[in-house]
Regions:
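The feature captures the beta-strand-to-loop junction immediately N-terminal to the Walker
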Residues: 45-47
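Helix-to-loop junction immediately C-terminal to a conserved catalytic motif
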Residues: 60
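Conserved ABC transporter NBD signature motif
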Residues: 68-76
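ABC ATPase NBD coupling module
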Residues: 76-93, 125, 199, 241
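Conserved ABC ATPase "signature" region
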Residues: 125-144
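Conserved ABC ATPase signature
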Residues: 148-152, 156
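Catalytic Walker B motif of ABC-type/P-loop ATPase nucleotide-binding domains
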Residues: 173-176
């Protein structure tokens, strides 16, 4: 059961024009230490630019830290050995803030690409189609295989992106602003869906600004301010700082 550990992690970005202090870099996160165990549901909260996306990118191995270590069961996510890379890649299902479905391809084709890129060993094309059918059922969109993203609502597209993240059965979902710009009903539907996914044992790590829903759900809440963790509260409320 994978445990994710961050040990004194920092990430900086070059700033060609400098900032008010004259420094040539900006802080993404600085001195972050965190442990997330399998089966947890963790909200990452904070204002725009606080470092939420950077933290999620570090956790999922999308970027490498400049200092510190990011570990999955003691194995470096940023610097794995060659034989560890595929295992680590299959551990994470990722949804980024930007919408990334290929608009001119069907839902089924979008999910097939993710399945192949993820390198999960589907024995036959039919096995892959059966998996696609299953994950679409999990997100409440059965029968949508032949639809195109342009024919669907924003909420439906976000659920398809979630299904795509789940196609290879990862034990960890890393979700960046999955509910951004959705109406209240769609937000609640997604949180209800994530609760069920988490109940089945999947770790959910999610950044969000949907404060009222975070307050209702009362899960673990990690609050980031200026790249540093200022709050980490079990059964917390949005923005809790301790």
């Amino acid at each position: 059961m994978p445990t994710i550990t961050l040990e004194n992690v920092s990430k900086y970005y070059k700033n060609r024009r400098g900032n008010r202090s004259g420094r040539r870099y900006e802080t993404g996160v600085e001195g972050v230490s965190l442990e997330i165990k399998q089966g947890e549901f963790v909200f990452i909260t904070g204002s725009n630019g606080a470092g939420k996306s950077t933290l999620l990118d570090l956790i999922s191995g999308r970027i490498k830290p400049d200092r510190g270590r990011v570990l999955l069961d003691g194995v470096s996510i940023a610097h794995p050995l060659p034989w560890q890379r595929e295992r680590i890649a299959l551990m994470f299902g990722r949804v980024v803030e930007e919408h990334t479905l290929i608009r001119k391809m069907t839902v089924e084709d979008n999910l097939m690409i993710a399945a192949r890129v993820g390198r999960k060993r589907f024995e036959t094309p039919q096995e892959m189609r059966d998996r696609i059918k299953k994950v679409l059922g999990l997100v409440g969109l059965s029968g949508m295989e032949g639809r195109y993203p342009v024919e669907m609502s924003l909420g439906e597209c976000r659920c398809i992106e979630l299904a795509r993240a789940m196609i290879n059965s990862p034990p960890v979902l890393v979700l960046d602003e999955l509910t951004a710009n959705l109406d209240d009903d769609s937000i609640w539907d997604i949180f209800h869906l994530l609760t069920e996914i988490n109940r089945r044992g999947t770790t959910v790590i999610m950044s969000t600004h949907a404060s009222q829903y975070v307050n209702i759900m009362r899960r673990r809440v990690v609050t980031i301010v200026d790249g540093q963790i200022l709050g980490d509260v079990q059964k917390g409320r949005y923005g809790d700082v301790i």
